Amino acid sequence: GYNQYGELGTGDTEERKIFTQVKGPNGEGILENIVQITTGYYTGYALTTNGEVYGWGSNRYGELGQGSKSDDPVLYPTKMKKVSNIIQISSGAEYIVMLDAEGKVWGTGYNGNGQLGIGNTTLQTLPQQMTSISGIKEISAKSNNTYMLTEGGYVEGVGYNYYSQLGDGSSTDRTTAVYTKNTSNKYVSDAKHISAGENSVFISRKKDSEGNPQGMYVIGRNDYGQLFTGNTTRAYYATEVEKEKDILTMALTEGQTGL
């Protein structure tokens, strides 16, 4: 694929028409012992078995977490500074968020909509801990939004909110995390998994007390009917859909959804 910014991690900026292995740090060998990967606009990231994060490609906004930013691409995987014991990674457009084993969330890179959740819109070149949150067990980022699922089944969101995709009933960007509400204006508290889309989010629900499926919640942009609501109206709050189904996996992209 496209490789102008070295986002394929092959040590150069030449496009590839067949799969090519990502090189190791400093171009030595290949990148190994990987348990998860994620990609930004022009950046690749990998999480290792020992909780380290490596990034390569564009570092224009400090999204590689090296303490600096540059228009020059980083051609080989480089270890993210300041973080350890990471168990999940998720990247937005030009930033990344990372969940550690203690339930804390860290982020670095572009922050123009507050998507790093640190109370401001200043870009960061080193990972910073998200403020006012704890007990997080799952994260999902897309474009300029970050979502967190708590151990208790609550959902929090931060960042861009023009399409009301944070589910707090407003269209105001948030620089600190807010709880997602349902159409009864109560906090969502039965979430099982989360998946961020382009200005929307899907939340699969736990089964009820009798073991019955409850489907999922959808929030945000709906120009193309991607929220399964049968219309193209924006969802300001978490809206119930597919209620009789037990949703196992969700995949979202711009204007399209798969379950």
Name each model feature, range by range.
Residues 1-259:
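Eukaryote-biased RCC1-like beta-propeller repeat architecture
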